[in-house]
């Protein structure tokens, strides 16, 4: 018996949600290998038609895009392609004309809330201007908020529909008006953590009965294997290495980390902070680093193919970020046994004083937490052991998704 599943995601770049989707697709492919009774025929449609992770797509997954470019939206060429895609979709089926009242009304609502987010408006344009597929699917899955959620709700024929939520819904700027109540059209909604679930249900309380936590899937054995491969830090620095992994975006609050590093250097000279990731905030962050004289101390290392040898060689993992859901980077750091410092928004993953330190997202608080951990080797070792024990693999969550096919 074959079951047709369509996944839709906004882009296929190197962010945490996209990596989690690849792990989920690989898991479904392995399910196909285990049994012949039920076979999943899996398709993927990428709304923007771009992203560098396409090369890691499992071989049995059918990419539905008529045209696709393996370009990162963080690169110049990738951004140009993105702008062309947006312009093109504006004129497909008269999208802009049809959406004009919605766009004007939503923008006015944003102005009233003093939170204008043009990207949120563009997701509706991209959704309505996207490709159309005639076939009906047994299950259609929107793997991100915004465009993919709108697209499946309005433009995909499926017996069952499911949507994933990866972020703090209200802090990210979404509203029911912006969504056009799209989540009322879904049979199941999967926030990736309990905190994410509670924030979502504040906006959509009537969806409580169909909303269940579905944790990010990570392959711990693959992470450990890749951590043992050649790579990692290439400098000859012999001091304490702090590591952060994440795209250079406003959401990640890197200015807080940079200013915290300035305070750390006032007390400790033998420490460096490395960031793995690329993004639109690079120039602004470089300017701040230069202005504080931290060129040799706060290192923007860019994106790397295999970050795990860096985790393995780091002394402390620091995750001082703004709003997001459940961090895959923290899960990876726990898998490799790093002591972790994180901002208070990560309470679901870190128990303060038990398997890491939680602190306010302020330079003073972050610097105090880092200095405390740097100065206490026994504390670092205790948190290392706790991180290794903390890592949990959520195998049963798969049944939440595949179970929809038989209801």
Which ranges hold each PLM region?
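A conserved mid-protein helix/loop that constitutes part of the nucleotide-sugar donor-binding site
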Residues: 18-23, 240-263, 280-286
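Glycosyltransferase donor-sugar binding loop
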Residues: 44-51, 245, 249, 272-285
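Donor nucleotide-sugar binding/catalytic pocket of nucleotide-sugar-dependent glycosyltransferases
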Residues: 160-166, 170, 184-225
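A charged, aromatic-enriched C-terminal amphipathic alpha-helix characteristic of glycosyltransferases
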Residues: 228-229, 361, 378-407
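Short alpha-helical segment that forms part of, or immediately flanks, the ligand-binding pocket
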Residues: 308, 326-335, 347-348, 354
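Conserved acidic donor-binding segment of nucleotide-sugar-dependent glycosyltransferases
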Residues: 352-353, 357-364, 372-377
């Amino acid at each position: 018996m074959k079951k047709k599943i369509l996944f839709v995601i906004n882009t296929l770049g190197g962010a945490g949600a996209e990596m989690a989707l690849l792990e989920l697709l690989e898991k479904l492919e392995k399910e196909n290998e285990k049994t012949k009774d039920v076979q999943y025929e899996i398709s993927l449609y990428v709304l923007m038609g771009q992203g560098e992770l396409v090369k890691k797509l499992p071989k049995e997954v059918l990419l539905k895009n008529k045209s696709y470019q393996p370009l990162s939206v963080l690169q110049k060429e990738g951004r140009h392609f993105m702008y062309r895609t947006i312009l093109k979709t504006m004129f497909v089926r008269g999208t802009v004309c049809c959406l004009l009242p919605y766009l004007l009304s939503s923008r006015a609502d944003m102005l009233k809330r003093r939170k204008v987010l043009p990207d949120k408006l563009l997701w509706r344009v991209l959704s309505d201007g996207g490709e159309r597929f005639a076939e009906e699917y047994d299950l259609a899955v929107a793997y991100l908020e915004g465009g993919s959620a709108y697209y499946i709700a309005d433009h995909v024929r499926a017996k069952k529909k499911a949507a994933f939520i990866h972020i703090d819904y209200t802090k990210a700027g979404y509203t029911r008006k912006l969504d056009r109540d799209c989540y009322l059209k879904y049979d199941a909604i999967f926030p990736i953590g309990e905190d994410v679930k509670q924030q979502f249900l504040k906006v959509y309380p009537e969806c409580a009965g169909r909303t269940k936590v579905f944790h990010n899937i990570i392959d711990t054995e693959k992470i450990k294997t890749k951590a043992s491969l050649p790579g990692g830090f290439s400098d000859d620095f012999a001091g304490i290495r702090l590591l952060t992994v994440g795209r250079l975006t406003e959401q990640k609050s890197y200015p807080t980390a940079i200013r915290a590093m300035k305070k750390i250097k006032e007390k400790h000279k033998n420490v460096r902070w490395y960031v793995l990731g690329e993004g639109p905030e690079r120039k602004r962050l470089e300017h701040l680093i230069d202005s504080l004289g931290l060129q040799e101390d706060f290192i923007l290392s860019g994106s790397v193919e295999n970050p795990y040898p860096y985790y393995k060689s780091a002394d402390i993992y620091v995750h001082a970020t703004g709003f997001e859901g459940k961090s895959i980077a923290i899960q990876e750091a726990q898998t490799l046994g790093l002591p972790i410092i994180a901002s208070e928004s990560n309470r679901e993953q870190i128990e303060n004083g038990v398997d890491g330190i939680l602190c306010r997202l302020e330079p003073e608080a972050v610097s105090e937490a880092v200095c405390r951990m740097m100065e206490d080797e026994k504390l670092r070792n205790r948190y290392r052991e706790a991180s290794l024990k903390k890592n949990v693999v959520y195998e049963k969550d798969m049944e939440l998704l595949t179970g929809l096919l038989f209801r």
